[in-house]
């Protein structure tokens, strides 16, 4: 019997509980010999979730065996999503899946293309390339498909396994109900880790698939941990550190990882950066840069520019605004260390900024431990942009078109500053130290 055809209880949650919590003794026994008793005791919470995932997948082994599986990442795949997918692919293969496909729409960063090429990861188009009637899984992002960072993917109503450290379970539950999702059979959303790859690596350790994926697969998972925690500097947990160390312990894996970290950027990236710094608005500790038009293959430069702006001394909120083939995109990075002891305040400010300026099309994540670091973004599809401000098809061609797109980004930048200034007037305590 296919898992996707098991009906959920009427009126029950969409995100199905993954089963009863395993006892502490059981968790200690399973992980004590793999990770050490002291480490297991100190990290019993997240390791309990790993064991729940293991037990849940074993429980559905008969349904997996002989069945095709789709693993969806964000539309634009990143190392954490791809590393997680490689590990989950091996786990599902161990459980007898007939075919497992990793579905990613594009690779926006040169490092991602380098990863796919060197680790020989085979990717499929999320719509045409999916297995019909396959079990649907998601890693490093959450249902429903067709929203947020999976915007171009056609939606489905049933999901088998989801692992994501970004989203809040309540938000995902609400979004799934709003978009007609019936059930997520094994839901691990809001994982307390710095990278989804760390969670999947620990799960892969229980399934004993590390040797199966070889040095390239271990390096892919290691790179996922490395990049999503900014070289293990921002937001890593003890599990991230331990999994990265164990994954890269052998020389072969370490050599592959070195090759993955050594990549080159196309000249266009530096042009975008120059434009951004030339068109930057600064108000106190807030910086907003207009980037202009960015090709789909270079989309990751938007987030990278926001991260670079945050490194400027005295900056608490850094934002980059660009136009892509998807729409008008905004990337935000923020750090609460300049706000005194009230670190949580930066989260409230970014939440207000994104939801007020881009209602219904934004999302963000943040570190839950002070000092809070925030990453956020929003994308207004072209249909909405045309209704509100401009027509892309009439303005993209030639220098005049490029200037029109840049001016559009400047107008968004000015609007974001205005939103913060309005917030300062309405709730001055929240913006103290920012403007």
Predicted regions and their residues:
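Active-site cofactor/cluster-binding pocket
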Residues: 117-186
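Anionic-ligand anchoring segments at beta-strand to alpha-helix junctions in alpha/beta enzyme folds, i.e.
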Residues: 68-131
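Helix-enriched interaction subdomains in cytosolic or periplasmic regions
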Residues: 11-51
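Mixed-charge interfacial surface used for oligomerization/domain docking
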Residues: 229-324
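Short glycine-rich or small-residue beta-strand-to-loop segments that form or flank ligand, phosphate
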Residues: 69-75, 224-226, 289-290
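Short alpha-helices
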Residues: 161, 165-246, 250, 355-357, ...
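Gly/His-enriched, cation/cofactor- and phosphate-binding structural elements
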Residues: 38-69, 97-99, 281-435
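Divalent metal-coordination and catalytic microenvironments
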Residues: 78, 88, 137, 164, ...
């Amino acid at each position: 019997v296919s898992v996707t055809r098991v009906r959920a209880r009427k009126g029950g949650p969409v995100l199905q509980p993954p089963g009863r919590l395993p006892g502490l003794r059981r968790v200690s026994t399973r992980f004590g010999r793999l990770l050490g008793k002291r480490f297991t005791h100190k990290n019993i919470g997240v390791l309990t979730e790993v064991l729940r995932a293991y037990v849940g997948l074993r429980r559905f082994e008969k349904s997996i065996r002989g069945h095709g599986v789709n693993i969806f990442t964000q539309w634009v795949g990143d190392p954490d999503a791809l590393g997680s997918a490689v590990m989950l692919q091996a786990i599902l293969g161990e459980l007898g899946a007939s075919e497992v496909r990793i579905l990613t729409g594009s690779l926006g960063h040169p490092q991602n293309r380098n990863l796919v090429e060197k680790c020989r990861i085979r990717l499929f188009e999320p719509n045409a390339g999916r297995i019909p009637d396959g079990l649907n899984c998601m890693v490093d992002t959450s249902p429903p498909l067709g929203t947020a960072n999976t915007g171009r993917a056609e939606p489905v109503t049933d999901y088998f396994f989801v692992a994501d450290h970004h989203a809040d379970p309540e938000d995902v539950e609400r979004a799934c109900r709003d978009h007609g999702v019936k059930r997520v059979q094994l839901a691990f959303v809001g994982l307390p880790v710095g990278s989804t790859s760390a969670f999947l690596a620990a799960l892969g350790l229980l399934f004993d698939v590390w040797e199966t994926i070889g040095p390239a697969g271990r390096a892919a998972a290691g790179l996922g941990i490395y990049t999503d925690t900014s070289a293990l500097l921002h937001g890593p947990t003890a599990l991230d550190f331990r999994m990265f160390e164990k994954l890269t312990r052998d020389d072969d894996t370490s050599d592959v990882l070195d090759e993955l970290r050594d990549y080159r950027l196309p000249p266009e990236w530096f042009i975008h950066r120059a434009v951004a710094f030339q068109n930057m608005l600064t108000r106190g500790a807030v910086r907003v840069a207009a980037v202009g038009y960015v090709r789909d293959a270079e989309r990751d430069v938007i987030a990278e520019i926001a991260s670079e702006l945050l490194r400027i001394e005295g900056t608490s909120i850094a934002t980059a605004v660009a136009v892509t083939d998807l729409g008008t995109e905004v990337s935000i990075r923020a750090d609460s260390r300049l706000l005194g002891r009230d670190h949580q305040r930066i989260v409230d400010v970014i939440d207000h900024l994104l939801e007020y300026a881009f209602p219904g099309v934004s999302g963000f994540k943040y570190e839950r431990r002070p000092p809070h670091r925030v990453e956020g973004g929003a994308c207004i599809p072209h249909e909405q942009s045309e209704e509100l401000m401009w027509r892309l098809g009439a303005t993209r061609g030639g220098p005049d078109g490029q200037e029109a797109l840049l001016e559009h980004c400047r107008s968004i930048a000015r609007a974001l500053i205005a939103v913060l200034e309005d917030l300062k007037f309405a709730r001055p305590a929240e913006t103290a130290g920012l403007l």
